Structures are given as C-alpha cells and as structure tokens.
Amino acid sequence: MSDNAQLTGLCDRFRGFYPVVIDVETAGFNAKTDALLEIAAITLKMDEQGWLMPDTTLHFHVEPFVGANLQPEALAFNGIDPNDPDRGAVSEYEALHEIFKVVRKGIKASGCNRAIMVAHNANFDHSFMIAAAERASLKRNPFHPFATFDTAALAGLALGQTVLSKACQTAGMDFDSTQAHSALYDTERTAVLFCEIVNRWKRLGGWPLPAAEEV
C-alpha cells in the first residue's frame, strides 16, 4: 500500500491546517466599526478511515463593543436585539478567548500546526473575527491571518451552487430557512456542507492522492 493511502489523519488532509467552521452575525458590514453580535464555531475531526465530521460546538451572543455602529437594516435582517437581556451576551474577549482556547487544544491533539477558518463567504466572517480579536487584545490568535476555506467557492465547484441554502439542498441536506441567519444554525449547516464536499471528493477517489507511477 502506498504512503499516500495511509493519509487519513486531519493533520495530513489540509497540509497541517486545523479547519474550524465559523459564522458570525453582525450589525453591519464594516468589521472595524460595526458590532459583532453573535459567533459560533465548530471544530472538525476525522475517523480512522479518514472521513471528516463535526466535533465540538461553541456558541456565544456578543455584547457590542463600546462605540460600535448598529445598522438598523442589519438588525432587521438578522432579527437580533442587542439590548435584549435574555441574549446572555458576553464580551468579545470572553467569546473569542474561549473559542481560541478550544481551537488551540484541537490543534495540539490533532497534530496540526495552525487553525484555518471555514466559512460561507469567508472573508466577511474572517474580517470580523480578526477585528474583534484585535479590539480584545488577544495576542495568541490560532487562526491563519488571511487564508480561509470558503464553502461558497467550494460549493460552486462541487455542487454548482454558491448560496448556502441551495448548496445544502443540492447536497441532499436539510435546510430550514426559518433558522437561517442564526450563527449557530448557519455554522452547523456550513460544517456539514464542508464535510460533505471533502468526503464526496474522497468517495470519488480524489483523496488520498494516487501515488506517482514509478518510471
């Protein structure tokens, strides 16, 4: 059996990157000025046969940082009331500190080197997480500073769809539009979608890579 056929560990699959699925809900589009209101994260794992699956889930409602913009259109879109005491919101520091702690443990346990964000239209989520981490003065950010796995692009390639709901449905997954734009629900769906795309590529024979033929 070739060495490539043995590549069933998470650290082998993504060049040492530890994929973590993230979704955020915000009060606008500007990561520097608009509030981060909700964040969810799901770590991933591989079984002994190399199939990817969701692992640990974390979810936080987040207090707007001091001076944050709250765009009415964004709040109407996601249905979040930042002043609702029942949200149980925590500071950006508390939410990201806990996520980063769990992610660092996962990196170590899996033998990976660094985390990489998986998200749908990932630049948006990545920019808000990075901005919040900077505001919170969190120096040990385990995520790559710019590289991401964008499921909008991956789903466009694998499924011919770039909208999360349509990509999930095309992949044979349930998608409840009434729960959409909840960071927790969108993260769960994105995690399952990413695993399906990665596992589908494996089922089609794309991974492990075939060994180079000896001359």
Swiss-Prot record:
Cofactor comment: Binds two Mg(2+) per subunit. The active form of the enzyme binds two Mg(2+) ions in its active site. The first Mg(2+) forms only one salt bridge with the protein.
UniProt binding sites for Mg(2+) 2: D23, E25, H181, D186
Superkingdom of origin organism: Bacteria
Entry annotation: catalytic residues: H181
EC number: 3.1.13.-
Record GO cellular component, one term: cytosol
Family recorded in the similarity comment: Belongs to the RNase T family.
Protein name: Ribonuclease T
Organism of this sequence: Shigella boydii serotype 4 (strain Sb227)
Gene name for this UniProt entry: rnt
